[in-house]
Amino acid sequence: MDPNMNNLLKWSIENSTSARQAADSNDAAPAPTSRSNLNPEMLSALFGGPSDADLMKAAMEALHSDEVDLENKMIAFDNFEQLIESIDNANNLEPLGLWTPLVELLKHEEAEMRRMAAWCIGTAVQNNEKAQDKLIVFNVLPTLVAMSTSDPAPAARKKAVYAISSGVRNYQPAMDEFVKHLPEGYTSGEKIDAADMDAIDALLDKLRAHPSEVSA
């Protein structure tokens, strides 16, 4: 991992951990603030440049790094998800080259990694046509449908359905692509309007009730 990216990740993790400890503490005394030695390059990246982009890239590097343990990957994922709640940051995923590595994590061996990847995708595409289109460009919907019906982890299946729900509502191209990959018998063959919330809800309810093909 690039040294500056690694330092940015550590800074983000340490400050996230300190904030959580402070929130969980019942002690009236303020929790000590974690301070890292931020060099000029890091300060420039954090405050003088595209800090959100740098943190997004650092988080993704951590998520694919064998040197980062699962606990810290979860923190990196949490930070990443909060960053892409911003539509501008969500739309920056493609220029930063982050869509492909994010989608790859849907097939990670760790269930929590799959769950968080689906959650992040759902956050990125919600009410965002530009990002919804990336579900087609990067062929994400077949993976999400398979995950929602066969992932051994219920929490991962639930987030896959959430990602689908966010991705197809009010965006017909994604809706049409989604229907193509549904299990047999889910639809009558008629076109489903992406603006028909009741029809979409009924379809997603079927997915939620779909028996997993693999025991949890």
Swiss-Prot record:
Q: Which GO terms describe its molecular function?
A: adenyl-nucleotide exchange factor activity
Alphabetical UniProt keywords: Cytoplasm, Repeat, Translation regulation
BP terms from Gene Ontology: cytoplasm protein quality control by the ubiquitin-proteasome system; regulation of translation
Region spans: Disordered: 19-39
Primary subcellular site in the record, as a coarse category: cytoplasm
Q: Which domain of life is it from?
A: Eukaryota
Where in the cell is the protein located? Cytoplasm
Under the heading Pfam families, the entry gives:
Fes1 (PF08609), HEAT_EZ (PF13513)
Segments annotated as ARM repeats: 27-68, 87-126, 129-169, 185-216
Q: Does the keyword Protein biosynthesis apply?
A: no
- For whether the record's keyword set contains Isomerase, the answer is no
* Entry-linked InterPro entries: ARM-like (IPR011989), ARM-type_fold (IPR016024), Hsp70_NEF-Inhibitors (IPR050693), Nucleotide_exch_fac_Fes1 (IPR013918)
The entry's cellular-component GO terms read: cytosol; endoplasmic reticulum
**What does the protein in this record do?**
Functions as a nucleotide exchange factor (NEF) for Hsp70 chaperones which accelerates the release of ADP. Required for fully efficient Hsp70-mediated folding of proteins.
* PANTHER family the record matches: HSP70-BINDING PROTEIN 1, PROTEIN FOLDING REGULATOR
Instruction: State the family named in the UniProt similarity comment for this chain.
Output: Belongs to the FES1 family.
Name of the protein in its database record: Hsp70 nucleotide exchange factor fes1
- UniProt lists the gene as fes1
